[in-house]
């Protein structure tokens, strides 16, 4: 029942408020930050829930006045007004009660890999990185390149970056998948349009203790930094390569060379490694769930083409959307204007979840008193 869920959240809200008011909580910054985020998530829900309880009581009182001929007309107007507001609150609560992604508040490990198209794909990877950097800045986030494999003509065959800030994963999670570009390369003398691809992976950054990595299974190599992220620091062995289970099918290689400090590069490399291991575990778990329910899940698969950037027509098409809603102005998107696409995808996801919630509940309006 919705009312039971709201009662549970109201009780949790009280516990969170009391915990935040405890001076001893300041000794644990990580837990304090977690509780602060949770308080922020619960506040709009509990505020509406309490308003619903007050208005429900007022509505009951107004209905009692219908028996009084002198008050009937006034009561009827009050009933209509209260009923309209209650319906609005219930609709808002339905949306707020939709399941949230537990990874939304995490930082992001962003990986771009040039695919089909050779040098042109590598150039487009740099264009996407520039787009993401501008998008991050506009969203109040920070994007920092950890490692990049430069290619000819100023492209990059691979880029690994970290995006930090409040709800970074929520801002970037829709970017995972294959991005296709259609344009005339600078090296094309005949003016022919080429099609190239870049694969983007978006990993929620693993938090401390989330994934256990056995140090004996990781080989650490150090070398002199070079290329993007390493300029000016290549006089010492500050770059770090972490190799998980080297020489086995499970091998994972992570390189970090953005800092002048070998210690900091090592720490960041291990964070990226843990994030990849967590993603591997999530992917395996999701695959088992798909096999169990014998269903195919499309949106979000890394191998899926999610978006096409058509330069001749100045159009970006997101293939997860439908109709005219799937097309956006390319120049705006490449300047970092991803927010409209993210909003449209998030809206579609909420609508899908809402339909599932309504189907599970069977009926609406089951809201109890606070």
From Swiss-Prot:
GO terms for molecular function: translation release factor activity, codon specific. It holds the Pfam family PCRF. The modification N5-methylglutamine is found at residue 231. Residues 284-293 have a biased composition (Basic and acidic residues). SMART domains: PCRF. Residues 284-303 are annotated as: Disordered. Belongs to the prokaryotic/mitochondrial release factor family. This is Peptide chain release factor 1.
């Amino acid at each position: 029942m919705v009312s039971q869920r709201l009662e549970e959240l109201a009780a949790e809200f009280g516990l969170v408020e009391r915990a935040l008011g405890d001076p001893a909580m300041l000794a644990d910054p990580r837990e304090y930050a977690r509780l602060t985020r949770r308080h922020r998530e619960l506040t709009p829900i509990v505020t509406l829930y309490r308003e619903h309880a007050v208005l429900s009581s007022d509505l009951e009182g107004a209905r009692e006045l219908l028996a009084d001929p002198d008050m009937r007309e006034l009561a009827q107007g009050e009933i209509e007004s209260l009923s309209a507001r209650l319906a609005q609150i219930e609709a808002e609560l339905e949306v707020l009660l939709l399941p949230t992604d537990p990874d939304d508040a995490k930082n992001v490990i962003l990986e771009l890999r040039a695919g089909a198209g050779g040098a042109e794909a590598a150039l487009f990877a740099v264009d996407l990185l520039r787009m993401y950097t501008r998008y991050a800045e506009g969203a109040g986030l920070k994007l920092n390149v950890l490692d990049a494999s430069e290619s000819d003509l100023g492209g990059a065959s691979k880029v690994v970056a970290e995006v930090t800030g409040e709800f970074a994963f929520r801002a970037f999670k829709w970017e995972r998948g294959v991005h296709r570009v259609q344009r005339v390369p600078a090296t094309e003398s005949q003016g022919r349009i080429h099609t190239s691809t870049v694969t983007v992976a978006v990993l929620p950054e693993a938090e401390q203790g989330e994934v256990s990595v056995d140090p004996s299974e990781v080989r650490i190599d150090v070398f002199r930094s070079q290329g993007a992220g390493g300029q000016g620091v290549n006089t010492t062995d500050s770059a770090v390569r972490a190799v998980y289970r080297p020489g086995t099918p499970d091998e994972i290689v992570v390189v970090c060379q953005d800092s002048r400090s070998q210690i900091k590069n090592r720490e960041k490399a291990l964070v990226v490694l843990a994030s990849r291991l967590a993603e591997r575990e999530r992917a395996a778990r999701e695959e088992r769930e798909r096999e169990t329910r014998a269903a195919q899940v499309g949106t979000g698969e890394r191998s899926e083409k999610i978006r096409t950037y058509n330069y001749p027509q100045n159009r970006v098409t997101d293939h997860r959307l439908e109709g005219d809603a799937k097309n956006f102005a390319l120049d705006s998107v490449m300047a970092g204007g991803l927010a409209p696409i993210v909003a449209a995808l998030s809206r579609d996801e909420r609508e899908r979840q809402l339909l599932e919630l309504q189907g599970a509940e069977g009926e609406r309006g089951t809201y109890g008193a606070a």
